[in-house]
Structure formats: structure tokens, C-alpha cells
A protein has these predicted regions:
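Boundary/linker segments flanking structured domains
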Residues: 1-79, 83-235
């Protein structure tokens, strides 16, 4: 047997290695329903939302997550990955703040509650169809962790549909309706000012359909061999 078969290069801080490491840590957490999170979800960090409902736009994702849950893996394909940072996140003082002190602040809980409120306001999604996992990280790692997981999982609300994570733009900041608010009516109607028309719904749906091409295989590639075997027998 040649030496090439007995060794392999491994860089523990390469983006792919870091993404896999963070992904494994996140997958090791039991997913909870988004509408049943406790205030104990504290500290800064990153999180993933998972969908298991009937909305036709996300049928491939919902089907895969439901099969994974039946296999005892919990949901495996995030619909959205985001971050929760403390106020003043750009200041050096916050970046160097003691993580133990930040753990007492409901930073993750606040951000996830904002997402829950967004979902509750729209007419074609239900909160009970969403699950969440959250991973507490020191602020200095949060942005990197979020970016790596978005690349790792390719969540549809990060890649193909923009606007889920935005806030009310306010009276002095008129803007176009986001892609997410075009597909899911209700949230934007509660905001301070009417929004200008955004991208046509048909064009957004085309983006989503293109996103699903080869998507399932790429998600399965993120799983460990053992977890993949457990799931593939059901697909």
C-alpha cells in the first residue's frame, strides 16, 4: 500500500473543517420547537431554524427534515441560519467582554423571539412547523460561525430568498418589499410605512426551484457516515 493511502492532509482551521466542526456541535443539540423556547436560551451565538410544514415552496426541505426526525436524527436541513450579537457588537469592548457575563443576557432568545413574531404575522406559515437549535459562542466567533454554516448548509432563506431577518425599516427609510415578504404576506403590512413593490413573485419562485437542484445530495454530504446511513434507508 502506498504512503498516499496511509495519510491525508488535514487543516483544522480550514473553512471546510471549521464548518464541519461547528455543524457537528449544532447537530448534537436537541432541536426545540420555535414557539416553545424558554428564556434560558441565553448568550450570544448562532442558530439554525428548521421547517417541517406544508408550504409548497419548501417541500423538498420539509420532506427531508420529517424523514430525518422519523429516523431519530432530528431535523437536519436548516431553512435559515443566523446570528445573535450583543448590542454594541462593533465595539472592541464588547468583543473582549467576558463570555460569562454575556451568558446572563437573553441575546439568542431575543433574536429567536423576533423570528417567531415574523412567522406569526404571515398568512402561509405556522410557528408549530419550525424547530430551532442554538449554539452559544464568544462574540469574536459569531460572524465567522454564521458565515461558515450558511456555506455548509445552503439554507434557502439565506441563499435564494432574501429578507427574513430584516427589521421594520421605519418611517424615514422607505424601501422595496423583500423577497421573503413577497412570498409571505402579513409581516410587512404591520410596518410603519407601505413598501414599494419588490421582485415579482414568479421570479422568486424560479430562484427557489433552481436552489433545489442537487440540494438534497449536498445536504446529505454534510452528515457523518453513520447519520447518513440511518437516513438513506428511509429515502
Amino acid at each position: 500500500m502506498s504512503a498516499a493511502r496511509l495519510s491525508a492532509r488535514y487543516n483544522p482551521v480550514a473553512p471546510k473543517s471549521l464548518a464541519e466542526s461547528i455543524g457537528r456541535a449544532l447537530e448534537g443539540i436537541e432541536a426545540a420547537r420555535l414557539d416553545d423556547l424558554t428564556p434560558e436560551v441565553r448568550g450570544p451565538g448562532i442558530y439554525a431554524l428548521y421547517y417541517v410544514g406544508p408550504c409548497v415552496y419548501y417541500e423538498p426541505l420539509s420532506t427531508l427534515n420529517k424523514e430525518a426526525m422519523r429516523a431519530g436524527l432530528g431535523p437536519i436541513a436548516p431553512i435559515y441560519v443566523g446570528k445573535a450579537m450583543p448590542e454594541g457588537q462593533r465595539s472592541r469592548k464588547v468583543e473582549l467582554e467576558d463570555l460569562d457575563a454575556l451568558l446572563e443576557k437573553p441575546i439568542l432568545h431575543k433574536r429567536l423571539s423576533e423570528h417567531l413574531a415574523s412567522i406569526e404575522r404571515v398568512d402561509n406559515l405556522l410557528p408549530e412547523h419550525f424547530f430551532a437549535r442554538a449554539l452559544v459562542l464568544a462574540p469574536v466567533w459569531v460572524r465567522l460561525g454564521e458565515s461558515l454554516l450558511i456555506q455548509h448548509y445552503e439554507p434557502v432563506w439565506n441563499h435564494a430568498v432574501t429578507g427574513f431577518g430584516i427589521h421594520n425599516p421605519g418611517k424615514n427609510r422607505p424601501q422595496k418589499r423583500s423577497e421573503w415578504d413577497t412570498l409571505h404576506r402579513g409581516r410587512a403590512e404591520t410596518w410603519s410605512v407601505p413598501l414599494k413593490p419588490g421582485k415579482p413573485k414568479e421570479a422568486i419562485i424560479e430562484k427557489i426551484e433552481a436552489h433545489w437542484q442537487g440540494w438534497r445530495d449536498r445536504v446529505l454530504d454534510t452528515l457523518s457516515p453513520e447519520r447518513r446511513r440511518l437516513l438513506e434507508g428511509r429515502l
